[in-house]
Amino acid sequence: MRIPRIYHPISLENQTQCYLSEDAANHVARVLRMTEGEQLELFDGSNHIYPAKIIESNKKSVKVEILGRELADKESHLKIHLGQVISRGERMEFTIQKSVELGVNVITPLWSERCGVKLDAERMDKKIQQWQKIAIAACEQCGRNIVPEIRPLMKLQDWCAENDGALKLNLHPRAHYSIKTLPTIPAGGVRLLIGSEGGLSAQEIAQTEQQGFTEILLGKRVLRTETASLAAISALQICFGDLGE
């Protein structure tokens, strides 16, 4: 049986024992039904793993003994910041989960003119928390030991105006360049913009051009927003990252 991987939000360096977070304790004790003496693998976002053993377990809390600390780097050398216009239903959750599995480092939910999702500030805050939990669960599943950040919602034009040394890319069905024709990726990585189901407006496309985005083509077919993001990330990781290594 595979040893369960559990995220711990506080640094475990130099710790010999700790209580799991409330969410983790509930998962371990109630869902997995694990008891004293069973093994876990903890990670705290530092790119290390911590073999651990349960020493106390009840309905309210789980206490573990830390048995060691090991560097376990599963990160791609290609840094990808995904700017994803929020989509309806479970599509956004699916995109976040699979993007994390494919190696994205940061995800910023975006609002655009044709975005069909309308949420007030309180509901959006709850969504961000939910999406961060999905990112954590994806790391637990895929073996990553650094949890990607889910940033607060931004307007598309504000996100496009940010400059962090990354190559800015925007998918466009009539672009003249493909991912294969891109130059060497800079040390700042890639800032990848994915629009909503309705695409970007003419004004938003003009804004991306003004902010230095390169339009790229991803095949001859029109892809749904959740397909486009995952296809683009996969292609980038194959050409410039660690897929296929």
UniProtKB/Swiss-Prot annotation:
One of its GO terms (molecular function) is rRNA (uridine-N3-)-methyltransferase activity. Its main location: cytoplasm. NCBIfam families: PRK11713.1-1, PRK11713.1-5, RsmE family RNA methyltransferase. Its EC number is 2.1.1.193. It comes from Haemophilus influenzae (strain ATCC 51907 / DSM 11121 / KW20 / Rd). Specifically methylates the N3 position of the uracil ring of uridine 1498 (m3U1498) in 16S rRNA. Acts on the fully assembled 30S ribosomal subunit. Belongs to the RNA methyltransferase RsmE family. It catalyses: uridine(1498) in 16S rRNA + S-adenosyl-L-methionine = N(3)-methyluridine(1498) in 16S rRNA + S-adenosyl-L-homocysteine + H(+). It is found in: Cytoplasm. GO terms for biological process: rRNA base methylation. It comes from the Bacteria. InterPro entries: Alpha/beta_knot_MTases, PUA-like_sf, RsmE, RsmE_MTase_dom, RsmE_PUA-like, tRNA_m1G_MTases_N. The keyword Iron does not apply. GO terms for cellular component: cytoplasm. The lineage of its organism: Bacteria, Pseudomonadati, Pseudomonadota, Gammaproteobacteria, Pasteurellales. Keywords: Cytoplasm, Methyltransferase, rRNA processing, S-adenosyl-L-methionine, Transferase. Disulfide bonds: none annotated. It holds the Pfam family Methyltrans_RNA. This is Ribosomal RNA small subunit methyltransferase E. PANTHER family: 16S RRNA (URACIL(1498)-N(3))-METHYLTRANSFERASE, RIBOSOMAL RNA SMALL SUBUNIT METHYLTRANSFERASE E.
